[in-house]
Regions:
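N-terminal, positively charged nucleic-acid-binding surface of large information/translation enzymes
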Residues: 2-243
């Protein structure tokens, strides 16, 4: 038998794995973090440090996480972990928005338009709550899989009585401070959902429209055309794409 060329080469000799093997190793690492209660250990280590609190704008609990969720949560995790490594006290309480059109829309898709039109409001609210509860759990596991450190067992949920009561108290304070007033403002309205829409909820699609030039004949006022040196009729020319 010939000599093995492997024995003639200066190959690296280390216990460090040559492959990351992330599909297998990442879940093990995350399980170890959870078993060791890493989030709480970091807080305990930095308990006397200067507080750094990142208020988490909540995602809607209306479906599995997507790349937008990942981008949002990973960037926040970068910021929080970097501050923790510098000695800051960094409690991170995640939350979910459990109200709103995105959740109701998913329930409507599930029921279909006929059942949705006939449903009673208490039943609709119950179904929306159940949908939100389901996807809070689904998204929580997705965020954990991204390696985000947080107090996942005690999130804030906007449909809990305590959270809703807090909103009422803050609204009362805003009213007493003169920040609430009645006025007029144009709003976007969804005729199928029967609800007002925020500007961020409006999606515009590209559309090909005709380009039209139109001339409008001006009514003659005695002496005006003559003074302007116009002999005969005068017109105003317009261009539009929305006939």
């Amino acid at each position: 038998m010939g000599n093995s060329y492997k024995e003639t080469m200066n190959l690296p000799k280390t216990d460090f794995a040559m492959r990351a093997n992330l599909p297998e190793n990442e879940p093990k690492r995350l399980a170890k973090w959870e078993e060791e209660k890493l989030y709480w250990k970091v807080l305990e280590k930095n308990k006397d440090g200067k507080p750094f609190v990142l208020h988490d704008g909540p995602p809607y609990a209306n479906g599995p996480i997507h790349i937008g969720h990942a981008f949002n949560k990973i960037l926040k995790d970068f910021v929080i972990k970097s501050h923790a490594q510098r000695g800051y006290y960094t409690p991170y309480i995640p939350g979910w928005d459990c109200h709103g059109q995105p959740i109701e829309h998913m329930v409507e898709v599930t029921l279909g338009p006929d059942k949705m039109a006939a449903i009673e409001q208490p039943t609709l609210r119950r179904l929306c709550r159940e949908w939100a509860e389901k996807y809070v759990d689904v998204q929580r596991e997705g965020f954990k899989r991204l390696g985000v450190n947080a107090d996942w067992e005690h999130p804030y949920l906007t449909f809990t009585p305590g959270y809703e009561a807090g909103n009422v108290e803050i609204f009362k304070k805003m009213y007493l401070d003169g920040a609430i007033y009645r006025g007029r403002k144009p709003i976007h309205w969804c005729k199928s959902c029967h609800t007002a829409l925020a500007e961020a909820e409006i999606e515009y699609s590209d559309e090909t429209s005709p380009s039209i030039f139109v001339k409008f004949k001006l009514d003659s006022i005695p002496g005006v055309f003559e003074a302007a040196g116009v002999d005969g009729s005068a017109y105003v020319l317009i261009w539009t794409t929305t006939p």
